[in-house]
Curated annotation (Swiss-Prot):
Its EC number is 3.6.4.-. PROSITE patterns: ACTINS_1 (PS00406), ACTINS_2 (PS00432), ACTINS_ACT_LIKE (PS01132). Actins are highly conserved proteins that are involved in various types of cell motility and are ubiquitously expressed in all eukaryotic cells. InterPro entries: Actin, Actin/actin-like_CS, Actin_CS, ATPase_NBD. It is an enzyme of class 3 (hydrolase). This is Actin. SMART domains: ACTIN (SM00268). Belongs to the actin family. Its main location: cytoplasm. CDD domains: ASKHA_NBD_actin. The keyword Glycoprotein does not apply. SUPFAM superfamilies: Actin-like ATPase domain (SSF53067). It comes from Mesostigma viride (Green alga).
Amino acid sequence: MADEGEVSALMCDNGSGMVKAGFAGDDAPRAVFPSIVGRPRHQGVMVGMGQKDAYVGDEAQSKRGILTLKYPIEHGIVTNWDDMEKIWHHTFYNELRVAPEEHPVLLTEAPLNPKANREKMTQIMFETFNVPAMYVAIQAVLSLYASGRTTGIVLDSGDGVTHTVPIYEGYALPHAILRLDLAGRDLTDYLMKILTERGYSFTTTAEREIVRDIKEKLAYVAIDYEAELATANTSSSIEKSYELPDGQVITIGNERFRCPEVLFNPGYVGMESAGIHETTYNSIMRCDVDIRKDLYGNIVLSGGSTMXPGIADRMSKEITALAPSSMKIKVVAPPERKYSVWIGGSILASLSTFQAMWIAKSEYDESGPSIVHRKCF
């Protein structure tokens, strides 16, 4: 942690599914909550409750029966700024319990985030929250830093979007970044669908949360999909039981690996796009021939949707099949990859060399929101 008397920076990673926030220098985020804002469906039905016009995060989640829930971040990009402001307000005042005007704030953005979005983010931080300094970093770059590298290709797959981001000497290569609109939320939807085919009914948003839990606890990636299906059909070795909140116990078999298989075969959910292995390969092929070897040897997985057991081995197998035969392939799956964007930000914001990189309020007052393009790249 920072020295006494020194003001610690705040690190906030805004994902499509979860917000991860905390203090730079810490080894894990203090606050992790859903990126949702809920508004009452009916005015004044809740007797004796101080009616709030909006609920954020876990509180919105727990009162979801009487609220309309919205995700202000879609596919990694902020689409609803009023709700986003509510999320940041909740992060600073309720979760971290700090005054934002007293701390520099490091925020994250999706790769290829539109310029206007970074400016809006900058403007809200300085004008609404009066922060003394701020910086915007690309999520995948922070994940790479967290793995102790400055060159490599990051496959970052969260709840709302997946990106492959080649990075050389600390700089993302924008022409080679690829985006795949297939991520955790789609895997949950697919698992709901295949469990329904098995005769279990999951339809509501509340039930979706149960299925998400089943996915997180039981899903895994098969090294050989066809062989695994054959095994599943002939034996019950992969079957696991799961207890629903009402006490009913359900059995889940081949769904365990059919669910994350979608990442390698998006066709299963009707998407005509390449799987994560092919997208990673395509991304590498868009880079200069001289740096490809460094990328093949440093494929770093990041984000919650890369947490399924077996994913690194399968990824390694698939990319080895695509790459030149003499190429050395290394897929790295750090155990803390669910939070590696946050951890990378925590590391970056506490480096002494980074202190000159912050955008100060004085610079913002002089240049306006466009300062972000000159100082954050």
